[in-house]
């Protein structure tokens, strides 16, 4: 599930727009994607190597009512992910580690650098902004409160992410919630319907039981027709799933004779949570992959929240690990240009400040929209890069609202709103240790689909959000704030987030190894089985690192050849 964002709105001067609620004041700007991509943020902190976590970031003392960590280690996908991780640590140590320049310190870039370091190489990680994380970045406001690019959920069906936490020794930073999916009931304001997965049953029986036990959202005839519609996917396996890439969710359901109410009751919410778009746009392959992971693994749909802000609680431990093995991470280092050799390979990277960075190999782990802006003209006619035109980031808005009181009609869990404009939300003052507050609620909400709203003012977005919240909290929230009052809010706009998983995108997703010798890609849009998600980003980084390790001899010869050519020129 891709409940994440990418880029916060930035000022024309390059700073981040921080939003505070103030009556009569709303002069913050919304930007189109072309106005956001590639802007360099000017922050005078050149390296992360001199920064260490504060004691507060290391030990969070608040005790929350979380569930025990599920037993994931026996799952086939977890074991496969663990084996891939181990292959880097056990690979033959190189005589001299490759210097690999990795652009982008989101999860894909961090993963690439981490596993290259595990294999004995020296990654140089470059991030254009002043903060680690990419789509999971977060910032602290003047009051010391954090606001994030998205609402980040860690599933049991994320084997590479779960292995990563274990490898870093930070499993305890995931706050596992009860194994349930909770949906708001639009026709019954203030009420919710649950799908509870019993711990005593194995998969897929626990999921089937959860569906059968819920009689508030689907009738028995609807459940039967939905099950019959899914039979081809169960029988046909992966080949069938891949063949559905050409259909939207809505088209597939009509072909299979699934009632429209199944779409209205379940798949609108699921589509928006997975890719921030509605079922009439989303590829059915995306839904089938998610259902397969959730139903075939006992703990696949079990959810966890990170216990604090992602840059400190997840990204910084990865950077510390990379640096401990000889790699380095550099912030405020925007890639300006990819300079080429006469043969079309990469000569070096030119940064926004004019500095030149050279390496034995080069990785771009930035979002696909940024990559397309950076592609040298000489590469644009190559089919591998031409196919990227089909991949476009989807807009999303993340909203944080601090209220003057503790809301009662909420759960210690992720909640699906089933609202036309809101996707999912959580009361972070309850679900997350670092954001815990016994007296006031902080709701974090994903506003999607956001295409029609991305350029609107913050006040318009907050006004519409409050109208939707009044339906979820009819006794506690009113659109005019006559009940709970807003203390402050932050609105984080992401014009281009994860790639839009529309039909026929799958053939356009590139392999991590490009046809350009020594040049590689990482990102959830690249070819890997988990689509647009945190899991997909981490796996793409591992596959990218694997390709580089496999190409070691070739890359060494290439570097020696380049050095010889330079000496000859001199």
Swiss-Prot record:
GO molecular function: phytoene dehydrogenase activity
Subcellular location per the Swiss-Prot or TrEMBL entry: Plastid, Chloroplast; Plastid, Chromoplast; Membrane
InterPro entries associated with the record: Amino_oxidase, FAD/NAD-bd_sf, Flavin_amine_oxidase, Phytoene_desaturase, Zeta_carotene_desat/Oxidored
PANTHER family for this protein: 15-CIS-PHYTOENE DESATURASE, CHLOROPLASTIC_CHROMOPLASTIC, PROTOPORPHYRINOGEN OXIDASE
Binding site for FAD: 104-120, 127-128, 135, 152-153, 158, 524, 534
Lineage: Eukaryota, Viridiplantae, Streptophyta, Embryophyta, Tracheophyta
Topology within the bilayer: Peripheral membrane protein
UniProt keyword list: Carotenoid biosynthesis, Chloroplast, Chromoplast, FAD, Flavoprotein, Membrane, Oxidoreductase, Plastid, Transit peptide
Assembly behavior: Homotetramer.
Pathway annotation from the record: Carotenoid biosynthesis; lycopene biosynthesis
Record-level GO cellular component terms: chloroplast; chloroplast thylakoid; chromoplast; membrane
Gene encoding the protein: PDS1
The enzyme's E.C. designation: 1.3.5.5
Gene3D superfamilies: FAD/NAD(P)-binding domain
Targeting signal (transit peptide) range: 1-91
Protein name: 15-cis-phytoene desaturase, chloroplastic/chromoplastic
């Amino acid at each position: 599930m891709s409940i994440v964002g990418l880029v916060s709105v930035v000022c024309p001067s390059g700073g981040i727009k921080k939003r505070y609620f103030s009556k009569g004041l709303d002069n913050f700007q919304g930007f189109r994607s072309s106005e956001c991509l590639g802007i360099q943020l000017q922050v005078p902190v050149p390296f992360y190597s001199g920064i260490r976590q504060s004691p507060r970031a290391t030990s969070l003392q608040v005790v929350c009512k979380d569930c025990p960590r599920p037993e994931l280690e026996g799952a086939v996908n977890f074991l496969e992910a663990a084996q891939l991780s181990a292959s880097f640590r056990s690979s033959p140590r190189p005589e001299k580690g490759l210097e690999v320049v990795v652009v982008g310190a989101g999860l894909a870039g961090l993963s690439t650098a981490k596993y290259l370091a595990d294999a004995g190489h020296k990654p140089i990680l470059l991030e254009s902004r002043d903060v680690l994380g990419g789509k999971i970045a977060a910032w602290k406001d003047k009051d010391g409160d954090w606001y994030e690019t998205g609402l980040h959920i860690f599933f049991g069906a994320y084997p590479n992410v779960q292995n990563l936490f274990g490898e870093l020794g930070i499993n305890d930073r995931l706050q596992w919630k009860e194994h349930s999916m909770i949906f708001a009931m639009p026709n019954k304001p203030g009420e919710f319907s649950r799908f509870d997965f019993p711990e005593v049953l194995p998969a897929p029986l626990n999921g089937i039981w959860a569906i059968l036990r819920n009689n508030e959202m689907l009738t028995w005839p609807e459940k039967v027709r939905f099950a019959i519609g899914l039979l081809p996917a169960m029988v046909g396996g992966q080949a069938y799933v891949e063949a559905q890439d050409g259909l939207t969710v809505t088209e597939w359901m009509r072909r299979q004779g699934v009632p429209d109410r199944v779409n209205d009751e379940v798949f609108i919410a699921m589509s928006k949570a997975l890719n921030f778009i509605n079922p009439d746009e989303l590829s059915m392959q995306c839904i089938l992959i998610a259902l397969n992971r959730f139903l075939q693994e006992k703990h696949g749909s079990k959810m966890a929240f990170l216990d604090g802000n992602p840059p400190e609680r997840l990204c910084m431990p990865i950077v510390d690990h990379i640096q401990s093995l000889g790699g380095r991470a550099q912030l405020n280092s925007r890639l300006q240009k990819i300079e080429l050799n006469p043969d079309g390979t990469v000569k070096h990277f030119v940064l926004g400040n004019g500095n030149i960075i050279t390496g034995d190999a080069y990785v771009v782990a930035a979002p696909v929209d940024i990559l397309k802006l950076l592609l040298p003209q000489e590469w644009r006619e190559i089919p591998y890069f031409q196919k990227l035109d089909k991949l476009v980031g989807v807009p999303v808005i993340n909203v944080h609202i601090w209220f003057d009181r503790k809301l009662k009609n909420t759960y210690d869990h992720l909640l699906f709103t089933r609202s036309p404009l809101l996707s999912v939300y959580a009361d972070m003052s309850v679900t997350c240790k670092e954001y815990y507050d016994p007296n006031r609620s902080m709701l974090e909400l994903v506003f999607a689909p956001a295409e029609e709203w991305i350029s609107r003012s913050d006040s318009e977005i907050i006004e519409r959000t409050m109208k939707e919240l009044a339906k979820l909290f009819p006794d506690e929230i009113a659109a005019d704030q006559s009940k709970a009052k807003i203390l402050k809010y932050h609105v984080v706009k992401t014009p281009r987030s994860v790639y839009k998983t529309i039909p026929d995108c799958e053939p356009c997703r590139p392999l991590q190894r490009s046809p350009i010798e020594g040049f590689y890609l990482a990102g959830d849009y690249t070819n890997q089985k988990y689509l647009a998600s945190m899991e997909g980003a981490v796996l793409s980084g591992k596959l990218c690192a694997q390709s580089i390790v496999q190409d070691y001899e070739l890359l060494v010869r290439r570097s020696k050849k380049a050095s010889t050519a330079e000496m000859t020129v001199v």
